[in-house]
């Protein structure tokens, strides 16, 4: 045997084979035909059952027999895929009208697998037979099956618009389809209106076909999405569960779910809601129970007393499949090609199919009627000369000779002669002669009617309308899905998402933040906080998990962090660096942190920079829904840094202290409220090469503690400060020395909450009690606390 070797490139071979494969799965596997709404395997299953007489009026047959018939004659693929397709056609939570009735376990809405095919039994549903009706009247084209042993239909007659009624879903190479189920009566009514007016608009069609009608019911939101889908084939709607509220004997309420969105797995939904409860993602749910039984679907969500049930419901809509979005993608095979189709195109394609089906059926019936008429006319003629016919037949040698004699002597046709010789003697009575004459009249009327249908397009359309109306009357059902015009915005109260709990918030100067339970904090004490070497506590306070933390940095930016999003870490352990929560720059430093319970307040923030700029912005401006990146708090110019952020409930005095020992005190009422992107105004009139080291709020009972680079601490009382106007030079707080003058490196307002100070050099730190520092007069340089020869030059001071 000679070999033929072809020299082909791998790219060409792969491209050609994948192209063939793609065409096959698009046309022969995954996408439905627009005319009957069926994929090939579904069509083959229904036809195999019909051909074998497995119809609704007969007994159920083993599913395995049907699967075997389908595989053996039409669909040479795995038995499991055929059985899965067969089972889906029987599932009333998948199809709006099932096409197969099945006895036994055919799966469940919990996605349980069906029983094996050897255990289940099935037969066609009554409605499925409407898809196959008249298939034996040459209504559709047949093609050879895969092994040329029999024929199979290319499409079913489909006496109702099955694609819209039962919808379809599938994925193929480069294409996917998602067509939702609809109400049969509405679809037929819309089709009837389209027949009456082919120019009908989508808006007008939507008076009859309201939107999808899912077998699982539910509430559909978004008329605009439905309209868009019906116009273009693509659109989006919201499908939410039907949820009712019940009150129990103990006064508690429970949410009862009786309908869920289409194709949502009920058991997965119950599991997800229970996980939200167990993980404390939502506060207020006591228990989740699946109470579904043979009477219908029922999920009970028992709530705590006095909880806001509406907020719980909204949270579940947002965070579980209690509400989903459904995306229309109405792709179907039309004229052998996949097409994205609007509802008018789908109805038009279906109508053209029905015109062809009814025309073919009418031609078939007309041909049979004319053939029968020809036979009846021959029989009537024969009966009118009965004695001569009998004599001729008796004188003939055999049946064949009798037929030839009848044709030759009395001019009967071959068909008439065959009917005459086959006539039984009892048919020669007067009754049968009358019956033949009656049949002749009926055939005349039928032929006239059939010819009228073929010759008159309107008459043909009327036949389609009559048959559609019959199906509508016989199979109509109430709409299951409620349609709401607008998509409801889901608003979730923070109290529902986050259990209210008092915790300790801490922030270190190096930017490590955490929340700690009060029990862990009380078991340790402030001084036992987990810190890295060289780090210290910037701030700690009691907050609520429903509060928000604002973290301000030297770049004039702030981080918006809900407290409940902070890691819950023990007091003795190291916190989480803010950069792990919200990304910040490498040289960005945390300067202060504040807690906000409610942004709807008259409070305000004051921002002060090293170069003497200041501004005031109200707290509500800082509320945001973006948590993932730093936000602008104030504009900080190049070569400047934000050094102070203060929060005040009302206007009060602030004191500004500079490196060269100048001090200016004035009221925040001199500052106008500005937006977040403003740079502010001049706070103090700085000398050359001077800069601000402190801007803080001050009151009459406070003192001010200052540290100089030479290791000196100076403490002054409020009375030394002179209240003035903003942007002035201020007063001098240091005695100027010609050689190695003192320069203030840090200063803080000391209130009753402060008792200790800590001085820092590059390599050392010194602790002491603030009360050990005596108050000084205005023009002094304070008292030396450390020897800079040993300690090093002081670079900073903190108080606590």
Swiss-Prot record:
UniProt keyword annotations, A-Z: Cell membrane, DNA-binding, Isomerase, Membrane, Topoisomerase
EC annotation from Swiss-Prot or TrEMBL: 5.6.2.2
Site feature: Interaction with DNA: 39, 75, 77, 88, 94
Residue ranges of domain Topo IIA-type catalytic in the record: 31-495
Reactions catalysed, as given in the entry: ATP-dependent breakage, passage and rejoining of double-stranded DNA
Subcellular location: Cell membrane
Tree of life domain: Bacteria
Site (Transition state stabilizer): 118
Pfam (any one): DNA_topoisoIV
GO cellular component terms listed in the entry, alphabetical order: chromosome; cytoplasm; DNA topoisomerase type II (double strand cut, ATP-hydrolyzing) complex; extrinsic component of plasma membrane
GO terms of molecular function: ATP binding; DNA binding; DNA negative supercoiling activity
Record-level GO BP terms: chromosome segregation; DNA topological change
Listed SMART domains: TOP4c (SM00434)
Membrane association type: Peripheral membrane protein
Catalytic residues as annotated in Swiss-Prot or TrEMBL: 119 (o-(5'-phospho-dna)-tyrosine intermediate)
InterPro entries for this protein: GyrA/parC_rep, Gyrase/topoIV_suA_C, Topo_IIA-like_dom_sf, Topo_IIA_A/C_ab, Topo_IIA_A_a_sf, Topo_IIA_dom_A, TopoIV_A_Gpos, Type_II_DNA_Topoisomerases
Family per similarity comment: Belongs to the type II topoisomerase GyrA/ParC subunit family. ParC type 2 subfamily.
NCBIfam families: parC_Gpos, PRK05561.1
Subunit structure and binding partners: Heterotetramer composed of ParC and ParE.
Annotated function: Topoisomerase IV is essential for chromosome segregation. It relaxes supercoiled DNA. Performs the decatenation events required during the replication of a circular DNA molecule.
The protein, known as: DNA topoisomerase 4 subunit A
